[in-house]
Amino acid sequence: MSYRSTLNPQQQASRAKNAVAEFLFRQLIVPKVYVDARWPNPHSRVDVLAVDRSGAGDVHVVEVKIGTEVLAVSAGMVASLLQIPAHFRYLALFENNNSLPDETCLYAPDGLGRVGVIQVKEDQGGDLSSELRVRPERFRFDASFKQVDKFTAAHPAYIEIRP
């Protein structure tokens, strides 16, 4: 039985964000994971932000797309993701029936970096799982580590390993 039909789009997006947060938590080394993070400033927001190595490592950002948003994944959508300072950037697609965005739009204009693609699936029981479909490549990091340190000190993580 699928619960997707009884949930509104905001609930579906929140479930997908949670699945992606859990995926990054399992993939990275002692990450701090944030959902709906105000990164890189209070006026912008990313769906999922993870900072590896207990807040001292690489920055990973994810934009989650659900339903009809998945069908409209375009170069413009990827271009806005490229404006967010992060070492690794991802699109997470929920309800996309295995389709992937055009690979050429996933690369940085200078070729240094590729946006990863995470597919979020719901099984018959309503459980979500995430799978890496396109491996990301490292981007130039256009922010300072002081900015990362300030963010992690000021915001409680959604998921983290406590000492």
Language model: regions and residue ranges:
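Conserved catalytic cores of phosphodiester-cleaving nucleases, focusing on short active-site segments
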Residues: 20, 48-74, 89
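Intrinsic disorder/low-complexity segments
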Residues: 20-22, 38, 47, 76, ...
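Catalytic cores of nucleic-acid endonucleases
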Residues: 66-120
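Acidic-basic catalytic patches of nuclease active cores, encompassing PD-(D/E)XK
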Residues: 1-44, 53-55
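Non-catalytic C-terminal interaction segments of nucleic acid-processing enzymes
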Residues: 3-4, 22, 105-163
